[in-house]
A protein has these predicted regions:
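Short, low-complexity, charge-dense intrinsically disordered segments
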Residues: 184-191
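Surface-exposed, charge/polar-rich loops and edge strands
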Residues: 2-183
Length: 191
C-alpha cells in the first residue's frame, strides 16, 4: 500500500546555481514510480505517494537521475507524514515560545555518527542556538539566518551526514499538505 512521503532536496534553485524547473523535477519522481507528485515552492520540496519498495531506494534513485539529467549533485532527504508530525510536535524552541519566523529545521539524511553531536560548539554563533534530535537539528536564529555560522557544511562535517534546512513556516505548510492527502479518499483505480 502506498503512503505519503516528502522529499527535501538540498541546494536547488538558490540563486543562479542548480536550477531545476519544478515540472521537470516532478517528472523525475513520476518516472521513478511515484504517484500524485506535487512540488511546493521552488526550493525542492516534493510530496508524493509511493509504495515501500520504491521509497526505500528513492533518495539514491532521484539523486542519480538529477545528476544525469541536470548535471547537479543534489542530496535527497525523505520523510513520512508520521515523521513530519513528530518534527513539528517535538520542536524544543517552539515549546519555549520562540517566534515562528526565527525557527528552522535541518533535516538529515541519516542519524549522526555516535557521539558526533558532542563535537558541536554550542557557542559557535550566539545568540543563535541549535538542538540535535534524532535525524533533525532544530535551529533558532534570532540574529538572522544569513549571518549564522551554523551552516549545513558545519553540521555535515561534524556529524558525518548531510542536511538541508527549511524554515518553520515551510515545515508546517509541508505537514499540512501531507495531512490533507491522508484525509482525501482516493479511487482505487487512480494513477
Amino acid at each position: 500500500m502506498s503512503a505519503t512521503h516528502l522529499a527535501l532536496l538540498r541546494g536547488i534553485n538558490l540563486g543562479p546555481k542548480n536550477k531545476i524547473p519544478m515540472p521537470d523535477l516532478a517528472e523525475v519522481f513520476t518516472k521513478a514510480g511515484c504517484k500524485d507528485v506535487r512540488t511546493y515552492i521552488q526550493s525542492g520540496n516534493v510530496i508524493f505517494e509511493a509504495i515501500p519498495e520504491i521509497s526505500i531506494r528513492l533518495p539514491e534513485l532521484i539523486a542519480k537521475e538529477i545528476q544525469k539529467r541536470f548535471g547537479h549533485k543534489v542530496p535527497v532527504v525523505l520523510r513520512t507524514t508520521g515523521e513530519m508530525r513528530e518534527v513539528v510536535r517535538e520542536n524544543p524552541f517552539f515549546k519555549e515560545g520562540a517566534a515562528e519566523d526565527i525557527l528552522h529545521v535541518m533535516f538529515l539524511t541519516d542519524l549522526p555518527k555516535p557521539g558526533a553531536a558532542k563535537s558541536l560548539d554550542p557557542d559557535r554563533s550566539p545568540p543563535n542556538r541549535f538542538m540535535v534530535r534524532g535525524k533533525e537539528i532544530y535551529l533558532l536564529f534570532p540574529a538572522g539566518f544569513a549571518r549564522t555560522k551554523l551552516t549545513s557544511s558545519y553540521f555535515d562535517s561534524k556529524l558525518g551526514t548531510i542536511g538541508t534546512v527549511r524554515s518553520w513556516r515551510t515545515v508546517t505548510k509541508l505537514l499540512e499538505l501531507m495531512k490533507e492527502r491522508n484525509l482525501t479518499p482516493r479511487r482505487r483505480d487512480a494513477k
